[in-house]
Amino acid sequence: RLSVLRYYRRPDLRILPQETFEDTCRLPSDRGRCKASFERWYFNGRTCAKFIYGGCGGNGNKFPTQEACMKRCGKA
């Protein structure tokens, strides 16, 4: 299985690897630290399921639609 590492810059300008494809899809749902209430989708190991996202923080296993979730993680 091919995993692709992508990089992003943090505010402190260090370059860090993002979660790999496989890692992202294996993370648990995480509503984050804020108190808003946004419907998002996460991959639960079998399929994509809804959860409530607080609006900030959390992890990469959150998607705006079920379709986006399945496109990224459906074959994980």
UniProtKB/Swiss-Prot annotation:
Question: Which residues are tagged with the site Reactive bond for trypsin?
Answer: K35, A36
- Localization, UniProt: Secreted
Which species is listed as the source? Cyriopagopus hainanus
Describe the task this protein carries out: Serine protease inhibitor that inhibits trypsin at a molar ratio of 1:1.
Family that this chain belongs to: Belongs to the venom Kunitz-type family. 02 (native) subfamily.
The name this protein carries in UniProt is Kunitz-type serine protease inhibitor HNTX-03141017
- Could you cite one Gene Ontology molecular function of this protein? toxin activity
Any S-S bridges, and between which cysteines? C25-C73, C34-C56, C48-C69
> Which positions make up the signal peptide?
1-21
The keyword S-adenosyl-L-methionine is assigned to this record? no
Please report the stretch or stretches of sequence annotated as the BPTI/Kunitz inhibitor domain: 25-73
**Per its UniProt record, what InterPro entries does this chain match?**
Kunitz_BPTI (IPR002223), Kunitz_BPTI_sf (IPR036880), Prtase_inh_Kunz-CS (IPR020901), TFPI/VKTCI-like (IPR050098)
Q: In which tissues is it expressed?
A: Expressed by the venom gland.
Entry's Gene Ontology BP terms: envenomation resulting in negative regulation of voltage-gated potassium channel activity in another organism
Keywords assigned by UniProt, alphabetized: Disulfide bond, Protease inhibitor, Secreted, Serine protease inhibitor, Signal
The annotated site for May bind Kv1.x/KCNA falls at L27
Task: List the top taxonomic levels of the source.
Answer: Eukaryota, Metazoa, Ecdysozoa, Arthropoda, Chelicerata
Classify the main location: secreted
Q: Does the keyword DNA damage apply?
A: no
Top-rank lineage group of the source organism: Eukaryota
Q: Which GO terms describe its cellular component?
A: extracellular space
Q: What PANTHER family does the entry give?
A: BPTI_KUNITZ INHIBITOR DOMAIN-CONTAINING PROTEIN, KUNITZ-TYPE PROTEASE INHIBITOR-RELATED
